[in-house]
Amino acid sequence: MTLNSLPIFLVLISGIFCQYDYGPADDYGYDPFGPSTAVCAPECNCPLSYPTAMYCDNLKLKTIPIVPSGIKYLYLRNNMIESIEENTFDNVTDLQWLILDHNHLENSKIKGRVFSKLKNLKKLHINYNNLTEAVGPLPKTLDDLQLSHNKITKVNPGALEGLVNLTVIHLQNNQLKADSISGAFKGLNSLLYLDLSFNQLTKLPTGLPHSLLMLYFDNNQISNIPDEYFQGFKTLQYLRLSHNKLTDSGIPGNVFNITSLVELDLSFNQLKSIPTVSENLENFYLQVNKINKFPLSSFCKVVGPLTYSKITHLRLDGNNLTRADLPQEMYNCLRVAAEISLE
């Protein structure tokens, strides 16, 4: 990974654990309940130390208040907002962040091109609402789209078209099936993070961009993986497929032998054997399967001074293995392992 890509990578990593933690005190170091600027909606707060942010959280609002020009960061979390009129943001062309989590928004009540007119918008978060499909059209400046915890059943082809700067998409906890999103992410060549966990996928969608670093399919109903599905993913580092219905017969021999992969989670499936992985893999989670054998060939093709597995954490607890099942030469292959959990 280049130094230029490191900052965005660190942001993505932090987002795994703090997806919705963008509180004002943490972000900007001020008290959000202090004095407000004169140019602010009366029911909201625009802190003196950060006057381009307007906080309207937890106010039981049913409509979006008038937003003064000059506001760049707008927070409307935990309200009762049901609709957005097309002219709502006409006065705030500089808006960069629009956070609408925990409201009552529906697609039919988001009017016209209300979002696409925001030519500087970078973050759009509409988590925990009542959406049934992805919102759109959206501005090409967008880099972070979060639509998790809705009732989304489809992402229409073209809904995300032209979003060349989009790096993060959260679609977890919806009602998506593979056919309803196949091809929806085509052309998103900057996409690094895609979360499709907790949906209704029975197979993997087609047409995902090969730029991805992090790809999450956990908590679905996936039973098999097409041969060479991940072949084009040259930079994929984190892959989660836990809590699915994967069996040995549904996993082609080398499908997880991805040289860029750092972490692979296959826990809580129905595997009886350990799939072959790259020697570059560092974290491998296989707990709560039906594994009953430990072939070193799954980790090391050849063992030598410079050829060994880089795995540091290996979880095998909740399987049909004991310490006695581990081959004596295991540590020649797994020589840098700091943790091997069996029970």
UniProtKB/Swiss-Prot annotation:
PROSITE patterns: LRR. InterPro entries: Leu-rich_rpt, Leu-rich_rpt_typical-subtyp, LRR_dom_sf, LRRNT, SLRP. Residues 1-18 form the signal peptide. SUPFAM superfamilies: L domain-like. Glycans are attached at N91, N130, N165, N257, N320. Belongs to the small leucine-rich proteoglycan (SLRP) family. SLRP class II subfamily. This is Lumican.
